[in-house]
Structures are given as structure tokens and as C-alpha cells.
Amino acid sequence: MWSFDGSSTLQAPGGSSDCLLKPVAIYPDPERKNGFLVMTEVLNADGTAHESNGRSTIDDSDNDFWFGFEQEYFLWDTETNLPLGFPKDQTPQGQFYCSVGGANTFGREIMDRHLDVCLDAGINVEGTNAEVAAGQWEFQTFAKGAQQAGDEMWVARYLLERIAEDYAIKIEYHPKPLGATDWNGSGMHANFSNTTLRTCGSKETYEKICEAFRPVVDECIAVYGAYNDQRLTGDHETQSITEFSYGVSDRGASIRIPIMTVESGWKGWLEDRRPASN
């Protein structure tokens, strides 16, 4: 157990400032000699979970739920206050997605270094790609169990931030940093499955599970990230924040049923496209 000054992080008052750090996962730190990265939970001084400690609320008694998170982000140029490589002539997006070449791709060195460091740390990064907007990137992680999935994403984010320091670049997680323009925002699409989804072989079961999300749209949106209303407009591969839909291969739906799930005889996973990048 360790402690820190919670008043300096706005997590405790100055007169009772101690917060505790409870180690929950450890990873080798590839960029330090004999170093380690320790994921922790924040506790109050009396040992109870701090109100910011969302991890402690996870009921994770087994690893039946598998998660694949797609973390989108912008590499943000602090000099121009625009995405790295953002075109001065407002070139329409389209040439940047999964692109290559100096006129299309900006910041690959950062992305590649982040991938290597994550893999060396034992974080299960499944892939990376340049995203739809200029200076926008994505990496994907996979884990079994909600706590491990969250731990690996947070440590991967930390490593990305630390690498960006060397380039004087900001990692921008705002879901719509370019505002109401004709440019994509950033999400963290959540792919998920359990034994039922992986084995049922039933279109009806998939539709029943998707329909179970319909009555709890507000509850989902409430925990899917700040400023998400700016991103979920119904444009740029999103469904409107006030609507709910699902469909096969439909990236304009709230929940996408991947074509591979269908082609595997309705055995696979679902993708909730609503969570924001932050």
C-alpha cells in the first residue's frame, strides 16, 4: 500500500488529504532498467474505495466476458492547436484512413513506438491503424475479464502519454476536438462477447441481446464519456445519441453485428459503437 496527497489531485480536502494506492496489476516497464508499471486502485484513508475508483465496482468473478477496445485519439500539435499534419486547405477526410505516405500519415513513429512498448510490457495490443481524420490514430486491446481489460487500456494510455512527451505532442481524447466540422470524432468502440454470444448460433438470441440495450440507452450514455453528444450526431459513422439501433455491418448503428459473426453461424461478438474516446 502507498499513499499520496489527494488534495493536489482534487480527490481529497487539504485537512484530510491522504489517499491510498492499492496495487492490482504489475507490468514490466520496457523503457526503464529494472522498472515496473503498477496499476493501482485509489482508496480513502480508511481503506474504502474512493468515489473515483470505478474499478472497485466491477463484479469480475470470472473471465466469461471478453473485451476488445478500439482506442481512437488525435496526435495534437500544441503549436498550431490542431491535429498533427492537419491540412491548411481543409482537404476533405478520406485519404487518411489506414494510409501511408507523407501527405497522408502523420505521427507513425509515435504510434509504432507505442505499439512496441505495449507489447514489451505484456499488454495485448491486437492492432493499430491510422484513422479517418488527419493526425488521428487507433490501437486495439483484447483481454478476458473486465478488470484486466480496463487495466491494460489504462496502462496503454499512460505509455502513450509518456511517449508523446518526447515529441512535445498532446494526446487528445476529446470525442469531437474539431467541433461541428465535417471531420470524424474519436470513440472507443467496445467489442464484447460471452459464452452465449460465442456459441449460440442463433440470430434470434443476438437480436434479443441487442434489444435488451434499448430500455437502458440513457444509463449507457451516462457512463460512455463526456461531450459524447458532440460526436453521436448520426453523421460520421455514428447513430444519434437520442436513438438506438443495431444491424449487421452497420457502422451507423448504436451496436454493430460484425459480418464475421454472421458468417460464423451467429457465433462471435457484438460491437457497441457509442462509447467515447475519453
Describe these PLM feature segments.
Residues 1, 148, 159-171, 198-278:
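C-terminal accessory/tail domains of diverse enzymes
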Residues 184-204:
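Acidic/histidine-rich catalytic neighborhood
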Residues 42-48, 102-103, 143-149, 194-198, ...:
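A generic structural motif
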